[in-house]
């Protein structure tokens, strides 16, 4: 008798994607982050669903409803903090997943990579609108500052901002629509993630060497299911440790003050995972220039497959490219630190230099290093 997982129309799809999937035998733990992102998404959707049952998207009651969730709802506090810190874990996994893709040349799978870039934009949009919902000071002012950036668009900017706000300032209409967006976007992310996987199944997984591994494949289950379970346990352990011991470590204390349009916080800054882009935005004195740099800092990822000049796919055997990759990582950490600092003398110039280096590395230095490595291969 044939196994049901191989014959049933629905089970067959799941079987081909997660059980009998031929997988390279040498993929490292850096390949765990895809499944961890799936786990993060499930955690976020479930905790978010329970939070939405008690949350009220109204300017007069939003802040109080979050307080009510934490104080009066059974285990509301843990659901709320799992959701808030789950977002941080999501972005840690996302950046590690992208870094892996960049290092090992996974961007050669054009369709998979491009869907990934779209996914990144969608996740960032979801996190942004979600941060507005508690209606604290940083929620309100973050929403005001970031949406206001669109006013830099010539001719239609001001109209566009007022259209997004649903009025002449961030108010009840803005909060209601942001809640609607925050509820629907995770399901769009889920659909895009499935498309991402469909495109990946077309080509099969890459591996650390970047060399085709068709002659050396092993089934996904049990070898990589057990490996993914270990990664999942470590993720859950980290998330629970963060949630139970330091729930506010990555948040902003200003968000415990109810939103007040008449009082501006001393330092307006987004959550830590957006600080690198915020630093790039602030490092350009011109408003439109800053907005374009902000957009390009993420959109540049879509051009990476075109900027790949090396004859080798992976960076495993390319020392110059490896060095520049880690310089890029250090540069992004520097930008993240600068984004959280006030706009004054030493930080401004460091932020500007780090922003220049970011674009220089991706657009010039890394492609040139790859060309030099191509020449050295002939020696």
UniProtKB/Swiss-Prot annotation:
Record keywords: Electron transport, Heme, Iron, Membrane, Metal-binding, Mitochondrion, Mitochondrion inner membrane, Respiratory chain, Transmembrane, Transmembrane helix, Transport, Ubiquinone
CDD domains according to UniProt? cytochrome_b_C, Cytochrome_b_N
This entry's Gene Ontology molecular function terms read:
metal ion binding; ubiquinol-cytochrome-c reductase activity
Q: How does it sit in the membrane?
A: Multi-pass membrane protein
Binding, heme b b566: 97, 196
> Which residues pair up as cystines?
none
Give the protein's biological function.
Component of the ubiquinol-cytochrome c reductase complex (complex III or cytochrome b-c1 complex) that is part of the mitochondrial respiratory chain. The b-c1 complex mediates electron transfer from ubiquinol to cytochrome c. Contributes to the generation of a proton gradient across the mitochondrial membrane that is then used for ATP synthesis.
Q: What is the protein's given name?
A: Cytochrome b
Task: Report the source organism.
Answer: Balaenoptera bonaerensis
Q: Which gene encodes it?
A: MT-CYB
